[in-house]
């Protein structure tokens, strides 16, 4: 569960290291975002000569959360960190690599490019 002012790590090679959630997209009073949801973030920390700079406001999709997610078969999955992948206006990732596992819930939300780049889908 990600809400406004949450800090997230970045799971791609766009050059950003830390993100800060500004807004959860999908309704004016929506408070929480989970895996596969799109949020508006600010880049709080970035490496030099990166595709994004510190202070940039971009969109990102959440790929891992510490809060567990229930699956239809009754199982649950949770991760060790809150991570997101920076995306462009057409919901394609800016980076060319994804680091760490991502959740299977991204497939239902139509983020196929992220699924194909990820080293492991849990």
From Swiss-Prot:
Q: Which UniProt keywords apply?
A: Ribonucleoprotein, Ribosomal protein, RNA-binding, rRNA-binding
Q: Which GO terms describe its molecular function?
A: large ribosomal subunit rRNA binding; structural constituent of ribosome
Q: One biological process GO term for this chain?
A: translation
Q: Quote the cellular component terms of the Gene Ontology held in the record.
A: cytosolic large ribosomal subunit
PANTHER family, sorted: 50S/60S RIBOSOMAL PROTEIN L14/L23, LARGE RIBOSOMAL SUBUNIT PROTEIN UL14M
By sequence similarity, the record places it as follows: Belongs to the universal ribosomal protein uL14 family.
What this protein is reported to do is described as:
Binds to 23S rRNA. Forms part of two intersubunit bridges in the 70S ribosome.
Q: How does it assemble?
A: Part of the 50S ribosomal subunit. Forms a cluster with proteins L3 and L19. In the 70S ribosome, L14 and L19 interact and together make contacts with the 16S rRNA in bridges B5 and B8.
Quote the protein name from its UniProt record. Answer: Large ribosomal subunit protein uL14
Organism, scientific name: Desulforapulum autotrophicum (strain ATCC 43914 / DSM 3382 / VKM B-1955 / HRM2) (Desulfobacterium autotrophicum)
- Gene responsible for this protein: rplN
């Amino acid at each position: 569960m990600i809400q406004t002012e949450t800090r997230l790590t970045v799971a791609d090679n766009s050059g950003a290291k830390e993100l800060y959630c500004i807004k959860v997209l999908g309704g004016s009073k929506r408070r929480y975002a989970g895996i596969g949801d799109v949020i508006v973030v600010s880049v709080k920390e970035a490496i030099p000569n990166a595709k994004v700079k510190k202070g940039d406001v971009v969109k990102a999709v959440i790929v891992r959360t510490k809060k567990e997610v229930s699956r239809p078969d009754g199982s649950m999955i949770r991760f060790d960190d809150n991570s997101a992948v920076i995306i462009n206006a057409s919901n394609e990732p800016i980076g060319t690599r994804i680091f760490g596992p991502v959740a299977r819930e991204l497939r239902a939300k139509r983020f196929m490019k992220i699924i194909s780049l990820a080293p492991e889908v849990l």
